Amino acid sequence: MRTSVCIKGTGSNFMRMSLMGLMLTVMSQVNAQQFNSDSWLSKPHGVMTIIPTFGERSSMLMNTFSLLPRWEFTMAAYLYNSDKDNTTDDGYSTSFYAKYMIYENPMQNGGFAVKAGTGTFPGTIDPDLREKDAFKTYWMNAPITIPFYDNKLSWDIMPGASFTRNFGPEETTAWSFTYSTRVAYNPWGPKFSVVGELFGTEGETGTLPEYKVGLRYDVSPNATFAFTYGQEFTDNNGAGFEIGAMLFTPPFVKIGKGEKQKHEYQ
């Protein structure tokens, strides 16, 4: 998960236009991944990942920096379009978090990690809360990746927990359990995958469970495109159609010397 900052009015309009302009600039060179689930993998030391996503409910620009071996540091901005009307301002939010890869198997196709931060991914917190002040919701989760069938099937599991400060009229601390799981199936080779995902939150700040299905195409070890459709199981306020990309830079943004790694990014 991740927390929310949402501001409306003139300042929000300026931020909205600035972020959209930056997204459009980046999108001309990149490819995306708009899933809530994550894998065990931390990108090789020094790699910067740029992830723009355009969708019906929200659009996103996420930047991840692998400044240290096994570590990733991420910041993201989300532009909301709750009423499906692009001419109105539905606010924006931000999230900041870190990830540490604890274990990787000898085949380098599975393992587990831990993530922690503030700011929520769209669909993982009550919509009313994402429009409150920043740094109210904090979270931690553990991405686990298990490969099957000679690496043709990859299963990501990501249990976690969150707490929101000053929740409700009594301004209590609200706790929730977060869950997310994703399956990627690539019977035609490693580049093309069919992906399905389920995620949600149970607790005081809970949400309706959502699903997301789509196609992911790994153009190269440095670029991945994804086209998805997401919806709530019992309502129609899900993500809708989304198109996104991931771009991985050469390893130049780093602190110190790192380990030699050989990966296809996920």
Regions found by a protein language model. Give the residues of each.
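Cleavable N-terminal export/targeting peptides
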Residues: M1-N36, F252-Q266
